[in-house]
Amino acid sequence: MKVLIIGKNIKNVYLSLDAKNFELDKNQNAHLDLVYDGGEKYYNDRFSIMTGQKLANEVISNFRIETETAFSPENPETCDDFQYILLSKNNYINLAPEFVKQCDFNSKILEKRTAKFDYLYIDWSAELNNVQIKTILDYLESHPKTKLAWCFDRSELPKLLSAPDLSKTNLTTFYRLLQRAEIVFVMGKKSQMMRVKQVLSTLSTLKLIYVTENQILAGVFKEDFRNKDIKVTRDVAATIIAGTTFSALITDWNLQRALMLAKINVENSKANKTLKINQLSDKLREALAIR
């Protein structure tokens, strides 16, 4: 089994803030002045990890699946988007910088004659443009046995929800690529789930896994989850859940067990370390003994 992971390397920079520096307004909402004077430090601790493609690669590799990555600089630490995450007690806020570095999609990896993959896995971080989508579609059309898994985050929901009839031909490249998907992960509100199901209903062989703030839903199965580590933010949790479920499904776990493994992984992982398959299997046996 060989998987090509397509996504960006994203650096999360966590700043732990001291609650005493916050000011409360008349409505008891907390505010913090983040104008730095060059000398005063507003945070107690600083910690950073790589997410996006790199985290997805770790999760999938932990299932002993062979992987390659499409955004492949020699040193991924030097080519990534990044965001600050402000931590205070049990809450966090994401701050995206105005200017970020952009990773280059290594399309040559799909042009090699030796490039044979069982699955292409598009992480939510990929943010593909039309040229990149066309490259992926061309590869799939010339490799009909290669399957596609695709993760959509909240920012991509409008495009997904406005999809035309996916049973038709002559669609744009984005929707033609969607037609090829065997597994789709969608991160969104539970209220939007039925509309997503309706849009994708014509893709009869598709497995849809829907992830909300605290639930994983697929078919008749549902798993509630809770992030025990505040550094496992929404985006990190989505990467762990999607990567775990995908890996379990393609290594012959059934859907119910795949969702249970995803719940276990997201609840027991640290932001910089996820569980290996033997650890997941042990914790799954413990969970089944309790249920």
For the regions a protein language model found, what residue spans apply to each?
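Internal, well-ordered alpha/beta segment that forms a basic, Gly-enriched binding/recognition surface
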Residues: A248
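Ribokinase/PfkB-type carbohydrate-kinase core domain
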Residues: M1-D37, N44-V236, T251-R291
